[in-house]
Regions:
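Conserved N-terminal alpha-helical segment that immediately precedes and caps sugar-phosphate-binding
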Residues: 1-353
Length: 353
């Protein structure tokens, strides 16, 4: 902390954030209790449902549950709008759905919940129990997310979702260190604050250099892929109106590499899971000089330590770290350079469509 304690974080309520961290820890206990109830009642499949950013956020949990789960566990990531027209053959009245909505009014999710309830499917939500979605699933099936106090990252939502998913795994005998994970991440918000402070000067530098670029590419994989999409689509496309291309490390070499040329910024997000080998291949290509493009940026979550956290848990918190670095701090600094308010929209929520 000594190296970063004097750094101010722009547009960020530090004390409020730590208070939110204490509150989200308590909310996590409620998510754990929901998972216990699901386990005791039994289930044949788990569905993670979202739209847009919430769909992206659930991607990391889908990855983790498939990584740590047994071969009989069925976990599916579904988009509410798509499910409304296509359904899913594996969903039955014994299935369980976890969804999330900050607004509590997402129409596609509301429509899906109505249909699922008619099927007898149990639906749980991370949302305000007094909102439309909360009322649709019932207050006893909701956990309210804490306010963000100026923080634009998704790490608290990740934490709550992980409490649910990892607890289900724990009750199946697949994630025996669940209690240790909860204990070691109880005060992780202090570390997330320190990571913000450490990254802030670099975020400012990157924003000044690339925020006004005509076109930018973002590459990620594994546990970080959902956050890669979320940052590039929800923050830069939706909130900054930037032209973006996001691509996985494994697909990068099957077409997208031909778009590289001098002057095109390329961001590579490197994670800490099996797919890091794929990220390493992309990094080797970017740094080889063969494209003549020197505007590449490597952001590696492994460079950001969390004291007291077991190495086994790094893969779980890596999306939290990336969200802190990009969705929060880099976005705030882009906003300053572009002078484009992150809350301004031309079409989104402006009228019915």
């Amino acid at each position: 902390m000594k190296e970063t304690e004097k750094i101010e974080i722009m547009h960020f309520d530090q004390e409020g954030y730590l208070e939110d961290g204490r509150n989200v820890y308590e909310a996590g206990k409620k998510m754990t209790a929901l998972a216990d109830r699901v386990h005791e009642e039994g289930y044949d499949a788990v569905f993670l449902m979202g739209v847009g950013g919430t769909w992206d956020e659930f991607m990391q949990l889908e990855y983790l549950m498939n990584k740590f789960g047994d071969r009989d566990l069925e976990v599916y990531l579904i988009h509410a709008a798509e499910w409304n027209v296509m359904g899913h053959k594996r969903m039955t009245d014994k299935s369980v759905v976890l969804t999330a909505s900050e607004s509590g009014t997402t129409p596609e999710v509301l429509e899906a919940i109505g249909k699922m309830r008619e099927m007898g499917v149990r639906v749980y939500a991370m949302t305000n129990p007094e909102g439309k979605i909360g009322q649709a699933v019932g207050a006893e099936n909701c956990v309210m997310m804490a306010s963000d106090h100026g923080a634009g990252g998704c790490e608290k939502g990740y934490y709550l979702a992980d409490c649910f998913g990892l607890r289900l795994l724990n009750r199946r005998g697949c994630f025996p260190k669940f209690d240790l994970f909860i204990e070691q991440t109880k005060d992780v918000w202090k570390d997330m604050l320190d990571i913000r402070k450490r990254f802030e000067p670099r975020a400012e530098e990157l924003a000044k250099k690339y925020a006004l670029a005509d076109y930018t590419m973002f590459i990620g994989s594994g546990a970080l892929w959902g956050e890669t999409i979320l940052y590039s689509m929800c923050l830069l496309e939706e909130m900054q109106w930037k032209r973006i291309r996001h691509i996985t490390s494994h697909d990068f070499f099957h077409g997208t590499l031909e778009l590289l040329e001098p002057g095109v910024p390329v961001f590579l997000f490197m994670g800490e899971d099996e797919c890091r080998a794929l990220d390493e291949r992309v990094r080797a290509f970017l740094t080889s000089g063969v494209t003549g493009d020197e505007d590449y940026v490597i952001i590696d979550t492994a460079e950001y330590a969390i004291p007291g956290l077991d190495d086994d848990f790094r893969v779980i918190v890596s999306p939290w770290i990336l969200s802190v670095l990009t969705t929060d701090r880099l976005s705030r600094n882009y906003e300053l350079v572009t002078k484009h308010n992150l809350k301004y929209r031309r079409y989104y929520h402006q009228f019915d469509y």
